Every structure is written in C-alpha cells, then in structure tokens.
C-alpha cells in the first residue's frame, strides 16, 4: 500500500527512492476504478513523482479498454446504466470516449458499467436494481474488484463495487471484472515496458 488516500506513506517514498536509485523499472498496479491517466495525474498530490514510474495500470482502465474495443460501432448503439459516485468530480469522466447511450433506468440498459457506489446507498439497496438487471440478463462490467476499503476521514470500512458485483454473481448475473490478482495486469504492465 503506497498511500492512505490523502498522502503517501513514508515507507513507500523510501522504497521508491531505493528502487529508482538502483535503476529498477516501477509499475503501479491498482484496483482503482479510475482511468490510468487520472491515477497518474493524482500522484503529485499524494507526494509522488510521476517520472518514478514507467506506467500505471488500473482495473478501471482495463474495463474502459475492454468496453471501447467491444462496442466500437455506432450501429445499434448500446444503452448503458452507469453506477458512479455523483459527488466525485471525476465520476462522469469515465464515460469520455465510450460509445454508449447512458440511461437513467437499469430496465432500459443493455449493460451496466459499475465504477463507484452511488452516494448513500448500502449493498442491500442494490438488490431491486440487480433483480431488474438479472431479469433482463444484463451483464455488469465492474471497474473495481475490491469488496471494501477504509474511509480516510472516519477509518470505517466502506464497500466497493466488487461487493456489488459479487452479489450480482451470486444471484446468477453475468459479471466481467478486471483487476488484481488477474494475470492480465502483469502482462499489460510488461507490454508498456516493451514499447
């Protein structure tokens, strides 16, 4: 773990300095639902130097790339129900470059893009939404496989989209998840080194 959400840990700074001084190639592999560029741009705010790392690969980026490749055509544009935290300023940025009609009701959707939980909803509150999706056989693309994280200000455990994806999977729903410990992460990072 490199940071607490606000600033980097001392052990992370020290380790990175030692590895950089020994000419080691460093990659960040993260289960963040954010795109990689967004995570890279955030590094200085956390106290890290961007040039300390060769690349950053996030689960969010892997899902975005998958959706971009899978739904290229303007023909029969798909309806997407997007689950995201409306209070986060970059919540809608994930949509940039994706070729979907974004809809407000899951019943109108062809797929679900699950990035970050809606504000003030608990896992149980998703059951009606997931039941409606299951009845329509809608696939969920989950951009964060983590089940929970620690809230910075309160130190409370809060759930992540991976928990909602797991509920949907146990209901019988189809869930596509990318992230650690998926082997594609390491190959994506290695591909970047070869470029």
Predicted features along the sequence, with ranges:
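Active-site phosphate-binding/coordination module
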Residues: 14, 20-99
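Glycine/Thr-rich beta-alpha phosphate-binding loop at enzyme active sites
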Residues: 143-184
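Structural motif
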Residues: 111-115, 141
């Amino acid at each position: 773990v490199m940071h607490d959400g606000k600033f980097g840990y001392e052990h992370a700074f020290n380790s990175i300095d030692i590895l950089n001084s020994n000419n080691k190639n460093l990659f960040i592999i993260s289960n963040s639902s954010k795109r990689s560029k967004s995570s890279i741009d955030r590094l200085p705010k956390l106290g890290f130097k961007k040039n300390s790392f060769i690349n950053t690969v996030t689960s969010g980026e892997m899902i975005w790339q998958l959706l971009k490749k899978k739904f290229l055509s303007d023909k029969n544009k798909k309806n997407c129900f997007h689950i995201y935290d409306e209070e986060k300023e970059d919540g809608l940025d994930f949509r940039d470059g994706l070729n979907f009609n974004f809809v407000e009701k899951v019943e109108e959707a062809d797929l679900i893009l699950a990035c970050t939980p809606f504000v003030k909803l608990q896992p149980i509150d998703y059951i009606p939404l997931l039941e409606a999706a299951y009845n329509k056989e809608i696939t969920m693309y989950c951009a964060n496989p983590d089940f929970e994280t620690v809230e910075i200000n309160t130190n409370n455990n809060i759930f992540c989209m991976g928990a909602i994806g797991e509920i949907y999977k146990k209901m019988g729903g189809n869930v596509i998840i990318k992230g650690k410990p998926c082997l594609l992460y390491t190959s994506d990072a290695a591909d970047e080194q070869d470029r």
